């Protein structure tokens, strides 16, 4: 077993001397190649070193191990094949896009030509619409103004009619309120004759006070009213209000009073 250790140590020394003698070479890369059994039953991997020079191309600057050289070469070949396959697919896709683009352009040329032919007709229609639209807008504005004015007039007339109708209602309501105010408040118990007489006296006193105040304010008008009430029309009137004619007197007929009495007595 000691001999194996010595052999491994000698190999390591030889490798170190080679690296020192060749300064242009790259750093050594260790690759496991051989396995040896130790006395303890474990595997001690003795790694012989293989030195590879760096190429000037950066593509080739890859760590290559002694045991993995074939694998790396296979990988590189596979990578090249993959790259070529990608290039082929890209070229196919580009060709398809070109052909499809040409077809799309050819299909779009027809509607473009048709649009160019119909363009002047469309512009004429647009100009006609622009001419018609302002006239319609003006007429609609005029109609709106007229309708608003008519609505205002209708509202004003309706309000005036409502005021005319409400005036008599207002007068009736005020009269009812005045009557309600003049009425005495109802008592809880039933009113007696004394309470009724007292209420009548109070009303008479209030009316007399109001008359006196009216006389004091307007004495002339009060006097005129009193005179009109006391004046009696001497001419009698019938039911229709027409004045009755007085019966003829004997003097108006040219007959004396005695003869008249005699005639009357005979008639009796």
From Swiss-Prot:
Residues 148-161 have a biased composition (Low complexity). A motif (RxLR-dEER) lies at residues 50-71. GO terms for cellular component: extracellular region; host cell. It is found in: Secreted; Host cell. Keywords: Secreted, Signal, Virulence. Residues 1-21 form the signal peptide. Its main location: secreted. The keyword Transmembrane does not apply. Residues 212-224 have a biased composition (Basic and acidic residues). Residues 120-257 are annotated as: Disordered. Belongs to the RxLR effector family. The RxLR-dEER motif acts to carry the protein into the host cell cytoplasm through binding to cell surface phosphatidylinositol-3-phosphate. Secreted effector that completely suppresses the host cell death induced by cell death-inducing proteins. This is Secreted RxLR effector protein 32. The gene is RXLR32.
């Amino acid at each position: 077993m000691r001999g194996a250790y010595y052999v491994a140590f000698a190999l390591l020394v030889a490798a170190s001397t080679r690296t020192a003698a060749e300064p242009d070479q790259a750093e050594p890369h260790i690759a496991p190649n051989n396995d040896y059994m130790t006395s303890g039953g474990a595997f001690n991997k003795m790694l012989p070193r293989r030195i590879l020079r760096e190429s000037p191309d950066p593509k080739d600057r890859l760590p290559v191990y002694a045991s993995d050289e074939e694998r790396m070469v296979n990988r590189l070949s596979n990578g090249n094949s993959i790259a070529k396959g990608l290039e082929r697919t890209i070229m196919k896709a580009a060709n398809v896009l070109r052909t499809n683009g040409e077809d799309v352009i050819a299909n779009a040329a027809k509607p473009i030509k048709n649009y160019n032919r119909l363009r002047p007709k469309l512009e004429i229609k647009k100009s006609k619409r622009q001419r018609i639209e302002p006239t319609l807008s003006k007429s609609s504005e005029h109609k709106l103004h007229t309708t608003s004015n008519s609505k205002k007039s209708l509202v004003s007339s309706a309000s005036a009619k409502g005021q005319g109708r409400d005036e008599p209602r207002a007068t009736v309501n005020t009269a009812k309120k005045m009557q309600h105010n003049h009425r005495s408040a109802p008592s809880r118990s039933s009113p007696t004759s004394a309470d009724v007489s007292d209420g009548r006296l109070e009303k008479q006193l209030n009316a007399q006070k109001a008359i006196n105040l009216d006389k004091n304010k307007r004495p002339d008008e009060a006097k005129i009213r009193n005179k009109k009430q006391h004046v009696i029309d001497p001419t009698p009137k019938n039911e229709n209000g027409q004045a009755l004619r007085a019966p003829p007197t004997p003097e108006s007929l040219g007959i004396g009073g005695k003869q008249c009495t005699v005639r009357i007595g005979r008639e009796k």
